Regions:
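Pyridoxal 5′-phosphate
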Residues: 1-389
Length: 389
């Protein structure tokens, strides 16, 4: 199988991740922070070390305990948004967002708790920070923006948006589902108050683990309560971090895989991985643009771009193209709206049932890309389209 669905989850994982998870769970598959025997202590140390690595990667701050774990980015976004948004607030977000942002905000707005404004993106796929500024109202308190689009791969101007937020006294939450481990995140430099991450994408970990980093001075109301393993006589849930946003037995196997994945990313270098992927992406983009009947969306520059590409073939439903790629060429991709319907409203692809998305990862090869290009050429030829010489 040629796997080009890395925006959904990276696959395969590095062999080091599989090996570490297997060994760790066999030798240390116990609950951290609950007991004083050696395996429990060592498991707790792994959790702490993972918090430290991610805090440093995101440049969150001095307190690594403010790096908290959850099931995934969607889970953390629910925790953070429900914990930050109060009655009467106005929230600004963008048309680039995934449903992990859109649906919590929609639900809160429908309940009459907040008002939401959706800022569009331009023809290149980027949000203009001035549009964020123009959308500010007297009761605006929060801006929520994706780090990178999961549909078109554009890396948003987070530092410039963060500057707008700081100048206007707004809190800034960034959904780093597609950004963490793929591109730089410097929370302090970029003015980001909360950064959301998931483990199973560019951090090269397993599914079922994600989290957030909340900077000092940002208040998140508690929405989860239960066991913490410490100070059990206290009747209410603990308010200090990390316990404030964590409750119950942790997914320690997920943390172990995340630890190994992050180490692999750091050892290989975020920039090195990204540059290698973008070399493949550029060839894919350039060649697909030369096929008659093929529309490639955005993808105007290699700068501020992740190795993600969406396209359609005239005369085909995207789902049918995906099926042909799978059955005839053994290429795995994603079709449809990619859980980001407002992106497709602007692209004009709602009536086309979305796009065909090819998303590259660190283990793709030039041979994979050549096969994908040939496949799209041959599918387009079924409608009489030819390669533009």
């Amino acid at each position: 199988m040629i796997y080009l669905d890395n925006s959904a989850t990276t696959y395969p994982k590095p062999v080091e991740v599989y090996g570490f998870m297997n060994d760790f769970y066999r030798d240390h598959g116990v609950s951290p922070g609950r007991s004083g025997f050696d395996a429990a202590i060592e498991t707790g140390e792994l959790v702490t070390e993972t918090r430290k690595m991610l805090t440093k990667m995101f440049n969150g701050g001095d307190d690594y305990n403010r790096l908290t774990f959850s099931y995934n980015a969607t889970d953390s976004l629910n925790i953070i948004l429900q914990g930050m948004i109060e009655k009467g607030m106005h929230v600004i977000t963008t048309m680039l967002e995934h449903n992990s942002v859109l649906r919590p905000l929609y639900t809160l707005e429908k309940k009459g708790i907040c008002e939401v404004t959706y800022v569009p993106f331009d023809e290149r796929g980027y949000v203009d920070p001035d549009d964020i500024k123009k959308a500010i109202k007297p009761n605006t308190r929060l801006v929520v923006c994706t780090h990178c689009s999961n549909v078109i791969g554009t890396v948003q101007p987070i530092a410039k948006i963060g500057k707008v937020c700081k100048e206007n006294g707004l809190l800034f939450v960034v959904d780093g589902s597609q950004g963490a481990g793929a591109v730089e995140m410097d929370m302090q430099k970029f003015g980001v108050d909360v950064y959301i991450f998931t483990g199973h994408k560019c951090l090269m970990g397993p599914t079922g683990i994600g989290g957030s980093y909340v900077r000092e001075g940002v208040t998140i109301k508690q929405t989860r309560f239960g066991g913490t393993g410490v100070r059990s006589a206290v009747p209410g849930h603990l308010e200090e971090y990390p316990y404030r946003l964590e409750a119950g037995t942790m997914n320690i196997l997920g943390v172990a895989g995340l630890y190994a994945g992050v180490k692999w990313v750091l050892n290989n270098g975020i920039r090195n991985i990204h540059d290698a992927e973008m070399k493949l992406w550029k060839k894919l983009r350039d060649r697909l643009r030369m096929i008659e009947g093929v529309t490639v969306y955005c993808a105007t520059s290699e700068e501020d771009q992740n190795p993600v590409l969406s396209f359609n073939i005239e005369g085909f439903n995207g789902g049918d193209v995906g099926t042909i790629l799978d059955v005839d060429y053994d290429i795995a991709c994603r079709t449809g709206l990619q859980c980001a319907p407002k992106v497709h409203e602007i692209l004009g692809t709602i009536d086309l049932h979305g796009t065909v998305r090819l998303s590259l990862g660190p283990f793709n090869t030039m041979e994979d890309i050549d096969t994908a290009i040939t496949a799209v050429e041959e599918i387009a030829a079924l409608k009489g389209f030819q390669y533009k010489c």
